[in-house]
Amino acid sequence: MKTLYSLRRFYHVETLFNGTLALAGRDQETTGFAWWAGNARLINLSGKLLGAHVAHAGLIVFWAGAMNLFEVAHFVPEKPMYEQGLILLPHLATLGWGVGPGGEVIDTFPYFVSGVLHLISSAVLGFGGIYHALLGPETLEESFPFFGYVWKDRNKMTTILGIHLILLGIGAFLLVLKALYFGGVYDTWAPGGGDVRKITNLTLSPSVIFGYSLKSPFGGEGWIVSVDDLEDIIGGHVWLGSICILGGIWHILTKPFAWARRAFVWSGEAYLSYSLGALSVFGFIACCFVWFNNTAYPSEFYGPTGPEASQAQAFTFLVRDQRLGANVGSAQGPTGLGKYLMRSPTGEVIFGGETMRFWDLRAPWLEPLRGPNGLDLSRLKKDIQPWQERRSAEYMTHAPLGSLNSVGGVATEINAVNYVSPRSWLATSHFVLGFFLFVGHLWHAGRARAAAAGFEKGIDRDFEPVLSMTPLN
């Protein structure tokens, strides 16, 4: 075997393949990893690993900018965003850019600016990635000790953790600043059907903010996904940003306690597994958030939630039949329950029919018709506004159901449109990615624990067919 780069930092895992097909310092013999193991070859080359990460960030930001401009180029202002397969413009609109009352897009220029800024940023990151991958120092420890590290240096690792937490905290505060001072954000609950507004009266009460995390995840409780006013969302970001920044300072200033040193595995692969586990949890939470929450993800941009489309259908036919003379308060359905209205298990008046299972739904077009005991019969008879009828008819025909061939909406709904809701795309993609990340977490956690215990030597490759084959070059 050739001289190892550094015995002290050699990762003892054998993955033989074809040692001839690699660059010096990044080949199988010096790193213990073959070419197909990707960045595992760079575990102990901090400079090259930096290049890989910066280049990866460049690819991510390039996608964001290019996809952003693609969506702007294809955008039709006359159609709702959710009918156009957009997944980036709804996020920009939710932040209050380019939209007015009712979520109507009045200016697409901010979206264009966002795309261009991301493209320019990606060029800078791409250059930095190529520089550090090809030209920069292989390791940072000698020339730039502040940026250098040894994976098992616990103090340095928690310092890096602290820096990352501070950056996340600053990110949370950027949303707070946008909502408070820089034009506000889109509030789907604004009177008359949603508008952009500045958030003035933040919720900072810890009992309210942390009350969400103590709620049950089931039914009408809905854990943090049940948040339904912007004051709570922005106030939550103040708390979260503060906790991240204070926690970051704490981790920079302190060394890990003895119990933490014993509890964790301190290696690069262990940190990878922790990160994948955290991202997996984020993916599953994001899946539930975008599927059920119509405040952080306004229905004007993302389309209605499943329960919302269902309740909208019940409301639309209640309106129609009431105009045709039906007494919606007492009409009986085929099961003997109320055809249009019935009572929930706890006594509230709710919509009847199959949509009874979604009786928890809260939506801006429906809440004005509720009284202290659920839906108010007198309001349903006298107070329904045209915008509520229009919006519910629109949502009824745009349920977030759909197949890959884009035959969207409820299969039995004759007025449904060919489309797949962005809610479907975002929820399913985040669920699948969350699952893959969880599998990756288990895989790398198992390898890291085995390596720490000293019995990870990879697969026995003495009889691997590839060893008897001619080298590729």
Curated annotation (Swiss-Prot):
Residue ranges of the TM segments: 69-93, 134-155, 178-200, 255-275, 291-312, 447-471
Compartment(s) of residence: Plastid, Chloroplast thylakoid membrane
GO molecular function: chlorophyll binding; electron transporter, transferring electrons within the cyclic electron transport pathway of photosynthesis activity; metal ion binding
Pfam families, per database record: PSII (PF00421)
Modification N-acetylthreonine, positions: T15
Chief place of localization: plastid
Ribonucleoprotein among keywords: no
Membrane topology: Multi-pass membrane protein
One GO term (biological process): photosynthetic electron transport in photosystem II
Cofactor note: Binds multiple chlorophylls and provides some of the ligands for the Ca-4Mn-5O cluster of the oxygen-evolving complex. It may also provide a ligand for a Cl- that is required for oxygen evolution. PSII binds additional chlorophylls, carotenoids and specific lipids.
Keyword line: Acetylation, Chlorophyll, Chloroplast, Chromophore, Manganese, Membrane, Metal-binding, Phosphoprotein, Photosynthesis, Photosystem II, Plastid, Thylakoid, Transmembrane, Transmembrane helix
Binding annotation for [CaMn4O5] cluster: E367
UniProt propeptide residues: 1-14
Top-level taxon: Eukaryota
Residue numbers carrying Phosphothreonine: T15
GO cellular component: chloroplast thylakoid membrane; photosystem II
Assembly with partners or alone: PSII is composed of 1 copy each of membrane proteins PsbA, PsbB, PsbC, PsbD, PsbE, PsbF, PsbH, PsbI, PsbJ, PsbK, PsbL, PsbM, PsbT, PsbX, PsbY, PsbZ, Psb30/Ycf12, at least 3 peripheral proteins of the oxygen-evolving complex and a large number of cofactors. It forms dimeric complexes.
Protein family (similarity comment): Belongs to the PsbB/PsbC family. PsbC subfamily.
Role played: One of the components of the core complex of photosystem II (PSII). It binds chlorophyll and helps catalyze the primary light-induced photochemical processes of PSII. PSII is a light-driven water:plastoquinone oxidoreductase, using light energy to abstract electrons from H(2)O, generating O(2) and a proton gradient subsequently used for ATP formation.
The protein, known as: Photosystem II CP43 reaction center protein
Organism: Chloranthus spicatus
